[in-house]
Amino acid sequence: TILEEVAFSCILLGESVKEANDHAMQVIEKLNLDPNASPFMLSRGQRQMVALAATVVTKPKILVLDEPTCGLDYMECLRIMQVVEDLRDHGCCVIMVCHDMEVVLDFATRLIVVNDGHILEDGSISHVFENKSICDEAALCAPLLCAVSQGLVKNGFAKCKGLYKRDMLVNALKKSCNL
């Protein structure tokens, strides 16, 4: 079962079966998985979530992810990224390869742009997306909120510079318009 598979990671680290099952259930519930389901009967996205759960349950200090949201539906993507964000918020260093710029915008704290095996840029999200030459060279398409922020700055809303989170952008506009 999914519960057995996820709990096995904790058992390997020396936890009792009860402790392992308790920890596994916490992660399984966050990912909205059926603990009694057979891993062999799951969709690709669900199998991906089980693999992540088996890793996350061990509370790693470093987590390396390669396209963790690839092929997932919107809700699966949100669940996975929420679990990853919780890990990061509790001190885990997360290194993620990702080509989905919306995911990058919502979850990354730093962006390293690699093109043809070479690092083009290493910096904040706003720094990278505001640098047109880097975006052009790496064929990066800035997410819509980046384009909106940059357009607002060009049209006199200087306080919108570098604001790529929806709430931050809305709040800056409210202040600028005295709302």
Question: What feature does the model see in each segment?
Answer:
Residues 38-42:
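Conserved ABC ATPase signature
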Residues 52:
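Hydrophobic anchor residue at the start of the ABC signature
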Residues 59:
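Conserved catalytic motifs of ABC-family nucleotide-binding domains
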Residues 63-66:
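Catalytic Walker B motif of ABC-type/P-loop ATPase nucleotide-binding domains
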Residues 98-99:
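H-loop/switch region of ABC-family ATPase nucleotide-binding domains
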Residues 104-106:
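A short, surface-exposed alpha-helical micro-motif characterized by mixed small hydrophobic
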Residues 116-117:
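Conserved ABC ATPase "signature" C-loop
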